[in-house]
Protein backbone atom coordinates (compact mmCIF):
# COMPACT_ATOMS: atom_id res chain seq x y z
CA UNK A 1 0.00 0.00 0.00
CA UNK A 2 2.88 2.40 0.56
CA UNK A 3 3.27 2.71 -3.23
CA UNK A 4 -0.19 4.26 -3.59
CA UNK A 5 -0.19 8.01 -2.98
CA UNK A 6 -3.68 7.87 -1.49
CA UNK A 7 -3.09 4.77 0.68
CA UNK A 8 -3.32 6.62 4.00
CA UNK A 9 -7.11 6.55 3.92
CA UNK A 10 -7.46 2.84 3.06
CA UNK A 11 -7.16 -0.27 5.22
CA UNK A 12 -6.43 -2.69 2.38
CA UNK A 13 -4.44 -2.61 -0.83
CA UNK A 14 -6.07 -2.23 -4.24
CA UNK A 15 -6.97 -5.39 -6.06
CA UNK A 16 -4.61 -6.16 -8.93
CA UNK A 17 -7.58 -6.09 -11.31
CA UNK A 18 -8.36 -2.55 -10.19
CA UNK A 19 -4.76 -1.46 -10.62
CA UNK A 20 -4.70 -2.69 -14.18
CA UNK A 21 -8.16 -1.37 -15.04
CA UNK A 22 -7.54 2.00 -13.39
CA UNK A 23 -4.14 2.66 -14.93
CA UNK A 24 -3.75 5.05 -17.86
CA UNK A 25 0.03 5.02 -18.13
CA UNK A 26 0.11 3.18 -21.46
CA UNK A 27 -1.90 6.04 -22.98
CA UNK A 28 -0.92 9.20 -21.12
CA UNK A 29 2.83 8.54 -21.21
CA UNK A 30 2.55 10.41 -24.51
CA UNK A 31 2.28 13.53 -22.33
CA UNK A 32 5.63 13.06 -20.57
CA UNK A 33 7.15 16.17 -22.11
CA UNK A 34 4.12 18.31 -21.27
CA UNK A 35 4.02 16.90 -17.73
CA UNK A 36 7.65 17.78 -17.10
CA UNK A 37 7.19 21.20 -18.69
CA UNK A 38 4.20 21.88 -16.44
CA UNK A 39 6.00 20.63 -13.33
CA UNK A 40 9.02 22.88 -13.94
CA UNK A 41 6.70 25.86 -14.36
CA UNK A 42 4.79 24.92 -11.20
CA UNK A 43 7.96 24.51 -9.17
CA UNK A 44 9.31 27.82 -10.47
CA UNK A 45 6.10 29.52 -9.41
CA UNK A 46 6.22 27.89 -5.95
CA UNK A 47 9.77 29.13 -5.43
CA UNK A 48 8.85 32.66 -6.49
CA UNK A 49 6.09 32.61 -3.86
CA UNK A 50 8.42 31.41 -1.12
CA UNK A 51 6.80 27.97 -0.93
CA UNK A 52 9.93 26.22 -2.21
CA UNK A 53 13.51 27.13 -1.47
CA UNK A 54 15.90 28.01 -4.28
CA UNK A 55 17.99 24.89 -3.73
CA UNK A 56 14.84 22.76 -3.75
CA UNK A 57 13.76 24.28 -7.07
CA UNK A 58 17.21 23.68 -8.56
CA UNK A 59 17.13 20.05 -7.46
CA UNK A 60 13.62 19.53 -8.84
CA UNK A 61 14.47 21.05 -12.22
CA UNK A 62 17.69 19.06 -12.51
CA UNK A 63 15.88 15.87 -11.54
CA UNK A 64 13.03 16.45 -13.99
CA UNK A 65 15.50 17.10 -16.79
CA UNK A 66 17.15 13.76 -15.98
CA UNK A 67 13.76 12.02 -16.06
CA UNK A 68 13.04 13.60 -19.45
CA UNK A 69 16.40 12.45 -20.78
CA UNK A 70 15.80 8.91 -19.53
CA UNK A 71 12.40 8.75 -21.26
CA UNK A 72 13.75 10.17 -24.52
CA UNK A 73 16.63 7.67 -24.52
CA UNK A 74 14.33 4.74 -23.75
CA UNK A 75 15.95 4.10 -20.36
CA UNK A 76 12.90 4.96 -18.27
CA UNK A 77 11.05 1.95 -16.86
CA UNK A 78 7.29 2.44 -17.12
CA UNK A 79 5.49 0.47 -14.43
CA UNK A 80 1.71 0.12 -14.61
CA UNK A 81 1.66 0.19 -10.80
CA UNK A 82 2.45 3.90 -11.06
CA UNK A 83 -1.02 4.34 -12.57
CA UNK A 84 -0.30 7.34 -14.79
CA UNK A 85 2.48 9.45 -16.25
CA UNK A 86 2.20 12.03 -13.46
CA UNK A 87 2.92 9.54 -10.68
CA UNK A 88 5.52 7.69 -12.76
CA UNK A 89 7.52 10.89 -13.20
CA UNK A 90 7.05 12.00 -9.59
CA UNK A 91 8.18 8.60 -8.28
CA UNK A 92 11.31 8.62 -10.44
CA UNK A 93 12.02 12.23 -9.45
CA UNK A 94 11.89 11.27 -5.76
CA UNK A 95 14.25 8.37 -6.46
CA UNK A 96 16.74 10.80 -8.01
CA UNK A 97 16.56 13.72 -5.57
CA UNK A 98 14.93 12.10 -2.55
CA UNK A 99 11.33 12.12 -1.42
CA UNK A 100 11.90 14.98 1.03
CA UNK A 101 12.33 17.39 -1.87
CA UNK A 102 10.56 15.43 -4.60
CA UNK A 103 7.46 15.16 -2.44
CA UNK A 104 7.19 18.95 -2.27
CA UNK A 105 6.59 19.35 -6.01
CA UNK A 106 2.91 18.51 -5.72
CA UNK A 107 2.26 21.30 -3.22
CA UNK A 108 -0.71 23.47 -4.30
CA UNK A 109 -1.49 21.13 -7.18
CA UNK A 110 -3.85 18.22 -7.86
CA UNK A 111 -3.62 15.67 -10.61
CA UNK A 112 -6.91 17.19 -11.77
CA UNK A 113 -5.36 20.52 -12.78
CA UNK A 114 -2.07 18.83 -13.63
CA UNK A 115 -3.56 16.56 -16.28
CA UNK A 116 -5.75 19.35 -17.65
CA UNK A 117 -2.62 21.46 -18.07
CA UNK A 118 -0.64 18.66 -19.72
CA UNK A 119 -3.53 17.94 -22.04
CA UNK A 120 -3.97 21.59 -22.99
CA UNK A 121 -0.28 21.96 -23.73
CA UNK A 122 -0.49 18.97 -26.08
CA UNK A 123 -3.63 20.30 -27.74
CA UNK A 124 -2.11 23.76 -28.23
CA UNK A 125 1.00 22.22 -29.79
CA UNK A 126 -1.18 20.08 -32.07
CA UNK A 127 -3.09 23.13 -33.31
CA UNK A 128 0.16 24.78 -34.36
CA UNK A 129 1.45 21.63 -36.08
CA UNK A 130 -1.79 21.14 -38.02
CA UNK A 131 -1.88 24.78 -39.10
CA UNK A 132 1.64 24.39 -40.52
CA UNK A 133 0.65 21.26 -42.47
CA UNK A 134 -2.50 22.90 -43.83
CA UNK A 135 -0.44 25.90 -44.91
CA UNK A 136 1.89 23.62 -46.86
CA UNK A 137 -1.07 21.89 -48.53
CA UNK A 138 -2.60 25.24 -49.50
CA UNK A 139 0.74 26.28 -51.00
CA UNK A 140 0.80 23.14 -53.15
CA UNK A 141 -2.71 23.89 -54.39
CA UNK A 142 -1.71 27.47 -55.16
CA UNK A 143 1.15 26.26 -57.34
CA UNK A 144 -1.35 24.30 -59.45
CA UNK A 145 -3.72 27.26 -59.51
CA UNK A 146 -1.04 29.56 -60.92
CA UNK A 147 -0.19 27.15 -63.74
CA UNK A 148 -3.61 25.88 -64.81
CA UNK A 149 -5.68 29.05 -65.29
CA UNK A 150 -6.42 27.98 -68.88
CA UNK A 151 -6.73 24.25 -68.27
CA UNK A 152 -10.44 23.76 -68.92
CA UNK A 153 -12.42 20.98 -67.26
CA UNK A 154 -16.06 20.24 -66.50
CA UNK A 155 -17.57 21.21 -63.19
CA UNK A 156 -20.27 18.99 -61.77
CA UNK A 157 -23.51 19.21 -59.85
CA UNK A 158 -25.20 15.93 -58.90
CA UNK A 159 -22.10 14.40 -60.56
CA UNK A 160 -23.54 15.55 -63.89
CA UNK A 161 -21.75 17.98 -66.19
CA UNK A 162 -22.53 21.55 -65.13
CA UNK A 163 -20.36 24.35 -66.57
CA UNK A 164 -16.79 24.64 -67.86
CA UNK A 165 -14.24 25.88 -65.33
CA UNK A 166 -10.46 25.86 -65.08
CA UNK A 167 -8.49 23.39 -63.00
CA UNK A 168 -7.20 26.45 -61.15
CA UNK A 169 -10.73 27.40 -60.15
CA UNK A 170 -11.45 23.83 -59.09
CA UNK A 171 -8.39 23.37 -56.87
CA UNK A 172 -8.85 26.82 -55.34
CA UNK A 173 -12.22 25.69 -54.01
CA UNK A 174 -10.37 23.18 -51.84
CA UNK A 175 -7.71 25.72 -50.90
CA UNK A 176 -10.42 28.00 -49.51
CA UNK A 177 -11.86 25.08 -47.53
CA UNK A 178 -8.44 24.55 -46.00
CA UNK A 179 -8.15 28.27 -45.27
CA UNK A 180 -11.32 28.00 -43.20
CA UNK A 181 -9.83 24.95 -41.48
CA UNK A 182 -6.82 27.05 -40.48
CA UNK A 183 -9.06 29.83 -39.18
CA UNK A 184 -11.10 27.29 -37.23
CA UNK A 185 -7.92 25.96 -35.61
CA UNK A 186 -6.80 29.50 -34.82
CA UNK A 187 -10.13 30.25 -33.15
CA UNK A 188 -9.98 27.04 -31.13
CA UNK A 189 -6.40 27.77 -30.12
CA UNK A 190 -7.46 31.15 -28.79
CA UNK A 191 -10.23 29.54 -26.71
CA UNK A 192 -7.77 26.97 -25.37
CA UNK A 193 -5.23 29.58 -24.30
CA UNK A 194 -6.29 29.68 -20.63
CA UNK A 195 -4.27 27.83 -18.01
CA UNK A 196 -6.03 25.44 -15.59
CA UNK A 197 -2.91 24.88 -13.44
CA UNK A 198 -3.50 26.15 -9.92
CA UNK A 199 -7.15 25.14 -9.90
CA UNK A 200 -6.10 22.14 -7.79
CA UNK A 201 -8.78 19.51 -7.18
CA UNK A 202 -11.69 21.86 -7.95
CA UNK A 203 -11.73 24.78 -5.49
CA UNK A 204 -8.26 26.29 -5.66
CA UNK A 205 -5.68 26.25 -2.86
CA UNK A 206 -5.06 27.92 0.48
CA UNK A 207 -1.48 28.68 -0.58
CA UNK A 208 -0.77 32.18 -1.85
CA UNK A 209 0.23 31.10 -5.36
CA UNK A 210 0.78 33.11 -8.53
CA UNK A 211 -1.19 31.46 -11.31
CA UNK A 212 -0.47 34.33 -13.70
CA UNK A 213 3.25 33.57 -13.43
CA UNK A 214 2.60 29.92 -14.27
CA UNK A 215 0.57 31.03 -17.29
CA UNK A 216 3.38 33.30 -18.46
CA UNK A 217 6.01 30.58 -18.09
CA UNK A 218 3.90 28.04 -20.02
CA UNK A 219 2.90 30.49 -22.76
CA UNK A 220 -0.80 30.84 -21.93
CA UNK A 221 -2.63 34.10 -22.54
CA UNK A 222 -4.41 33.97 -19.18
CA UNK A 223 -5.66 31.64 -16.45
CA UNK A 224 -8.96 29.80 -16.19
CA UNK A 225 -10.93 32.21 -13.97
CA UNK A 226 -12.98 29.49 -12.24
CA UNK A 227 -11.17 26.55 -10.64
CA UNK A 228 -14.11 24.18 -10.96
CA UNK A 229 -14.40 24.93 -14.66
CA UNK A 230 -10.63 24.69 -14.92
CA UNK A 231 -10.51 21.01 -14.00
CA UNK A 232 -13.86 20.10 -15.60
CA UNK A 233 -13.34 21.67 -19.01
CA UNK A 234 -12.59 19.53 -22.04
CA UNK A 235 -14.03 21.92 -24.60
CA UNK A 236 -10.53 22.49 -25.92
CA UNK A 237 -10.25 18.79 -26.76
CA UNK A 238 -13.70 18.70 -28.33
CA UNK A 239 -12.86 21.78 -30.40
CA UNK A 240 -9.72 20.15 -31.76
CA UNK A 241 -11.55 16.91 -32.52
CA UNK A 242 -14.26 18.86 -34.34
CA UNK A 243 -11.70 20.88 -36.27
CA UNK A 244 -9.95 17.68 -37.34
CA UNK A 245 -13.29 16.13 -38.31
CA UNK A 246 -14.02 19.08 -40.61
CA UNK A 247 -10.51 18.89 -42.09
CA UNK A 248 -11.23 15.27 -42.94
CA UNK A 249 -14.61 16.19 -44.39
CA UNK A 250 -12.73 18.40 -46.84
CA UNK A 251 -9.81 16.07 -47.55
CA UNK A 252 -12.18 13.12 -47.94
CA UNK A 253 -14.14 15.03 -50.59
CA UNK A 254 -10.91 15.86 -52.40
CA UNK A 255 -9.73 12.26 -52.17
CA UNK A 256 -13.06 10.99 -53.49
CA UNK A 257 -12.63 13.19 -56.55
CA UNK A 258 -9.01 12.18 -56.99
CA UNK A 259 -10.22 8.58 -57.02
CA UNK A 260 -12.90 9.38 -59.60
CA UNK A 261 -10.71 11.64 -61.72
CA UNK A 262 -7.91 9.06 -61.87
CA UNK A 263 -10.26 6.29 -62.98
CA UNK A 264 -10.45 5.09 -66.60
CA UNK A 265 -13.90 6.63 -66.91
CA UNK A 266 -12.47 10.12 -66.29
CA UNK A 267 -8.67 10.05 -66.71
CA UNK A 268 -8.46 13.72 -65.72
CA UNK A 269 -5.42 13.06 -63.57
CA UNK A 270 -2.78 10.38 -63.18
CA UNK A 271 -1.56 9.56 -59.70
CA UNK A 272 2.16 8.87 -59.49
CA UNK A 273 3.32 5.27 -59.25
CA UNK A 274 5.09 6.33 -56.05
CA UNK A 275 1.72 6.84 -54.39
CA UNK A 276 -0.21 3.97 -55.96
CA UNK A 277 -0.44 0.26 -55.24
CA UNK A 278 -1.18 -2.84 -57.30
CA UNK A 279 -3.29 -5.95 -57.07
CA UNK A 280 -2.29 -9.40 -55.85
CA UNK A 281 -4.13 -11.01 -58.78
CA UNK A 282 -4.80 -8.39 -61.49
CA UNK A 283 -1.53 -7.29 -63.15
CA UNK A 284 -3.07 -4.20 -64.74
CA UNK A 285 -4.31 -2.58 -61.54
CA UNK A 286 -3.08 0.76 -60.22
CA UNK A 287 -4.97 1.61 -57.06
CA UNK A 288 -5.32 5.04 -55.37
CA UNK A 289 -4.78 3.64 -51.88
CA UNK A 290 -3.62 6.93 -50.34
CA UNK A 291 -6.91 8.60 -51.20
CA UNK A 292 -8.95 5.59 -50.16
CA UNK A 293 -7.21 5.36 -46.79
CA UNK A 294 -7.73 9.04 -46.04
CA UNK A 295 -11.37 8.64 -47.00
CA UNK A 296 -11.58 5.62 -44.71
CA UNK A 297 -9.78 7.28 -41.80
CA UNK A 298 -12.45 9.98 -41.82
CA UNK A 299 -14.72 7.54 -40.01
CA UNK A 300 -12.13 7.16 -37.26
CA UNK A 301 -11.81 10.86 -36.55
CA UNK A 302 -15.58 11.28 -36.60
CA UNK A 303 -15.82 8.43 -34.10
CA UNK A 304 -13.28 10.04 -31.78
CA UNK A 305 -15.32 13.25 -31.72
CA UNK A 306 -18.57 11.44 -30.97
CA UNK A 307 -16.82 9.38 -28.30
CA UNK A 308 -15.64 12.41 -26.31
CA UNK A 309 -18.95 14.22 -26.75
CA UNK A 310 -20.65 11.17 -25.28
CA UNK A 311 -18.16 10.92 -22.40
CA UNK A 312 -18.73 14.56 -21.43
CA UNK A 313 -22.46 14.87 -22.02
CA UNK A 314 -23.73 14.17 -18.48
CA UNK A 315 -20.75 14.48 -16.17
CA UNK A 316 -21.43 16.28 -12.89
CA UNK A 317 -18.87 18.87 -11.80
CA UNK A 318 -16.00 18.70 -11.27
CA UNK A 319 -13.51 15.99 -12.27
CA UNK A 320 -14.68 12.42 -12.91
CA UNK A 321 -12.66 9.34 -13.80
CA UNK A 322 -14.62 9.15 -17.06
CA UNK A 323 -12.36 11.96 -18.24
CA UNK A 324 -9.41 9.59 -18.24
CA UNK A 325 -10.90 8.38 -21.53
CA UNK A 326 -10.44 11.80 -23.16
CA UNK A 327 -6.90 11.38 -24.45
CA UNK A 328 -6.74 8.30 -26.62
CA UNK A 329 -9.12 9.75 -29.21
CA UNK A 330 -7.18 13.01 -29.33
CA UNK A 331 -3.84 11.25 -29.72
CA UNK A 332 -5.28 9.08 -32.48
CA UNK A 333 -7.00 11.92 -34.35
CA UNK A 334 -3.97 14.20 -34.17
CA UNK A 335 -1.61 11.51 -35.47
CA UNK A 336 -4.09 10.46 -38.14
CA UNK A 337 -4.51 14.06 -39.29
CA UNK A 338 -0.80 14.80 -39.38
CA UNK A 339 0.05 11.59 -41.23
CA UNK A 340 -2.78 12.11 -43.71
CA UNK A 341 -1.99 15.76 -44.48
CA UNK A 342 1.68 14.95 -45.02
CA UNK A 343 1.07 12.12 -47.48
CA UNK A 344 -1.81 13.90 -49.23
CA UNK A 345 0.44 16.88 -49.89
CA UNK A 346 3.25 14.63 -51.15
CA UNK A 347 0.84 12.77 -53.44
CA UNK A 348 -0.73 15.94 -54.84
CA UNK A 349 2.68 17.36 -55.74
CA UNK A 350 3.23 14.46 -58.15
CA UNK A 351 -0.14 14.13 -59.90
CA UNK A 352 -0.23 14.56 -63.66
CA UNK A 353 -2.96 16.80 -65.09
CA UNK A 354 -4.37 15.35 -68.33
CA UNK A 355 -5.46 18.56 -70.05
CA UNK A 356 -6.74 17.00 -73.27
CA UNK A 357 -8.96 14.53 -71.46
CA UNK A 358 -10.41 17.32 -69.35
CA UNK A 359 -11.15 19.42 -72.43
CA UNK A 360 -12.69 16.51 -74.32
CA UNK A 361 -14.95 15.81 -71.36
CA UNK A 362 -16.32 19.33 -71.70
CA UNK A 363 -17.82 18.29 -75.05
CA UNK A 364 -20.33 16.14 -73.22
CA UNK A 365 -23.30 17.19 -71.13
CA UNK A 366 -24.23 20.40 -72.99
CA UNK A 367 -22.30 22.57 -70.54
CA UNK A 368 -22.74 25.77 -72.58
CA UNK A 369 -26.52 25.75 -72.17
CA UNK A 370 -26.51 28.27 -69.32
CA UNK A 371 -24.39 30.66 -71.40
CA UNK A 372 -26.99 30.53 -74.17
CA UNK A 373 -29.82 31.20 -71.73
CA UNK A 374 -27.95 34.14 -70.20
CA UNK A 375 -27.31 35.50 -73.69
CA UNK A 376 -31.02 35.50 -74.52
CA UNK A 377 -31.79 37.36 -71.31
CA UNK A 378 -28.96 39.84 -71.70
CA UNK A 379 -29.09 40.51 -75.45
CA UNK A 380 -32.69 39.69 -76.42
CA UNK A 381 -34.43 40.86 -73.25
CA UNK A 382 -36.18 37.52 -72.89
CA UNK A 383 -37.32 36.51 -69.37
CA UNK A 384 -34.99 33.89 -67.92
CA UNK A 385 -37.68 31.22 -67.57
CA UNK A 386 -38.58 31.55 -71.24
CA UNK A 387 -34.89 31.55 -72.19
CA UNK A 388 -34.48 28.42 -70.08
CA UNK A 389 -37.25 26.73 -72.09
CA UNK A 390 -35.79 27.80 -75.45
CA UNK A 391 -32.32 26.50 -74.62
CA UNK A 392 -33.85 23.34 -73.20
CA UNK A 393 -35.30 22.73 -76.65
CA UNK A 394 -31.85 23.30 -78.18
CA UNK A 395 -30.46 20.62 -75.86
CA UNK A 396 -33.28 18.27 -76.84
CA UNK A 397 -32.54 18.79 -80.55
CA UNK A 398 -28.83 18.18 -79.97
CA UNK A 399 -29.70 14.96 -78.16
CA UNK A 400 -31.74 13.83 -81.16
CA UNK A 401 -28.76 14.50 -83.42
CA UNK A 402 -26.41 12.73 -81.00
CA UNK A 403 -24.16 15.76 -80.53
CA UNK A 404 -23.26 18.23 -77.80
CA UNK A 405 -24.63 21.77 -78.16
CA UNK A 406 -21.05 22.97 -78.55
CA UNK A 407 -21.01 21.07 -81.86
CA UNK A 408 -24.14 22.71 -83.33
CA UNK A 409 -23.27 24.48 -86.58
CA UNK A 410 -26.24 26.85 -86.78
CA UNK A 411 -28.41 27.67 -83.77
CA UNK A 412 -30.85 29.73 -85.86
CA UNK A 413 -32.04 26.58 -87.59
CA UNK A 414 -33.31 25.34 -84.24
CA UNK A 415 -34.75 28.69 -83.12
CA UNK A 416 -34.64 31.96 -85.09
CA UNK A 417 -34.13 33.95 -81.89
CA UNK A 418 -30.45 33.01 -82.13
CA UNK A 419 -28.18 35.07 -84.39
CA UNK A 420 -24.57 34.73 -85.48
CA UNK A 421 -23.37 36.40 -82.28
CA UNK A 422 -24.89 33.56 -80.30
CA UNK A 423 -22.58 31.14 -82.12
CA UNK A 424 -19.61 32.87 -80.48
CA UNK A 425 -20.85 31.56 -77.16
CA UNK A 426 -20.26 27.96 -78.17
CA UNK A 427 -16.68 28.17 -76.93
CA UNK A 428 -15.51 26.80 -73.61
CA UNK A 429 -12.79 29.37 -72.95
CA UNK A 430 -15.20 32.19 -73.81
CA UNK A 431 -17.70 30.72 -71.37
CA UNK A 432 -15.14 30.50 -68.61
CA UNK A 433 -14.01 34.11 -68.99
CA UNK A 434 -17.44 35.62 -69.58
CA UNK A 435 -18.20 35.41 -65.87
CA UNK A 436 -18.10 38.85 -64.26
CA UNK A 437 -19.19 38.22 -60.68
CA UNK A 438 -16.74 38.14 -57.77
CA UNK A 439 -15.56 34.64 -57.01
CA UNK A 440 -16.31 33.35 -60.49
CA UNK A 441 -14.31 31.11 -62.82
CA UNK A 442 -12.85 33.84 -65.03
CA UNK A 443 -9.09 34.20 -65.16
CA UNK A 444 -9.31 37.69 -63.64
CA UNK A 445 -11.34 36.36 -60.73
CA UNK A 446 -9.07 33.36 -60.26
CA UNK A 447 -6.07 35.68 -60.02
CA UNK A 448 -7.81 37.64 -57.26
CA UNK A 449 -8.56 34.42 -55.43
CA UNK A 450 -4.91 33.41 -55.63
CA UNK A 451 -3.94 36.79 -54.16
CA UNK A 452 -6.36 36.32 -51.25
CA UNK A 453 -4.88 32.94 -50.38
CA UNK A 454 -1.29 34.08 -50.80
CA UNK A 455 -1.93 37.00 -48.48
CA UNK A 456 -3.50 34.67 -45.96
CA UNK A 457 -0.65 32.15 -45.81
CA UNK A 458 1.99 34.90 -45.74
CA UNK A 459 0.47 36.13 -42.49
CA UNK A 460 0.43 32.71 -40.81
Curated annotation (Swiss-Prot):
CDD domains: Argininosuccinate_lyase. Its EC number is 4.3.2.1. PANTHER family: ARGININOSUCCINATE LYASE. This is Argininosuccinate lyase. GO terms for molecular function: argininosuccinate lyase activity. One of its GO terms (biological process) is L-arginine biosynthetic process. Pathway: Amino-acid biosynthesis; L-arginine biosynthesis; L-arginine from L-ornithine and carbamoyl phosphate: step 3/3. Keywords: Amino-acid biosynthesis, Arginine biosynthesis, Cytoplasm, Lyase. Its main location: cytoplasm. It holds the Pfam family ASL_C2. InterPro entries: Arg_succ_lyase_C, Argininosuccinate_lyase, Fumarase/histidase_N, Fumarate_lyase_CS, Fumarate_lyase_fam, Fumarate_lyase_N, L-Aspartase-like. The lineage of its organism: Bacteria, Pseudomonadati, Campylobacterota, Epsilonproteobacteria, Campylobacterales. The keyword Lyase applies. Belongs to the lyase 1 family. Argininosuccinate lyase subfamily. It catalyses: 2-(N(omega)-L-arginino)succinate = fumarate + L-arginine. The keyword Cytoplasm applies. It is found in: Cytoplasm. GO terms for cellular component: cytosol.
